[in-house]
Regions:
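Strand-loop microenvironment adjacent to phosphate/nucleotide-handling motifs in alpha/beta enzyme folds
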Residues: 3-189
């Protein structure tokens, strides 16, 4: 919203955004964590057996950023077609087998245990890359864009001022209410 608002005020610069999936082997990617857990003998921890995520390579992420700059008209959101979501449980299984290990149901076996630790607050079972708006084509058939709705500059400035006040007063309910009214799909945690 802030980037989209900034774009409206700019005459010389086009502002746009990219929405990433999980970048394989980046610092925050689950794959290095799983490899470390497997090397330590397990368990491999997942939040939920049904969680799915999109994945992209570092090269795809870099290309998305560069091409988004080329395709930008201003205020756009660019998203890479990353194919189907991957079930994290299946990824954990494959990495265990690729390491030459087996999976065990408990920590007394010879294999690696996959342990569900529960969803974190606000974590979803699946990712939604397109929040609102339509999926629009770009010159690259693997990259699409979405022109998502956003509040007027006046509404945004007022909301930010209200947020600052609620934060200073530690008004959690007030903060959540502002975010709920401002952000489509906002989920209270």
């Amino acid at each position: 919203m802030i980037v989209q608002s900034k774009n409206l005020k700019s005459q010389n610069t086009k502002f746009c955004m990219v929405r990433f999936g999980n970048v394989i082997n980046s610092s925050g990617s689950v794959i290095p964590l799983f490899r470390k857990q497997i090397a330590a003998g397990g368990p491999v921890t997942i939040t939920h057996k049904k969680v799915t995520r999109f994945f992209m390579t570092i090269a795809e992420a870099s290309s998305l950023v560069i091409q988004a700059g080329e395709f930008a008209e201003g205020g756009d959101v660019f998203i890479l077609d990353m194919g189907e979501q991957v079930r994290i449980f299946d990824l954990a299984e494959k990495l265990i087998y690729l390491s030459g290990r087996n999976i065990t149901a408990d920590d007394n076996g010879e294999g690696i245990q996959i342990q569900e630790i529960g969803l974190r607050p606000g974590e979803k079972l699946y990712e939604e890359l397109l929040i609102s708006g339509k999926e629009l084509k770009t010159p690259n058939n693997k990259i699409f864009k979405s022109n998502e709705d956003f509040p007027s500059d006046e509404v945004l400035v007022n909301a930010i001022d209200d947020l600052k006040e609620k934060i200073e007063n530690n008004d959690i309910a007030g903060i959540k209410n502002i975010l709920k009214n401002l952000i489509e799909g906002f989920s209270e945690v």
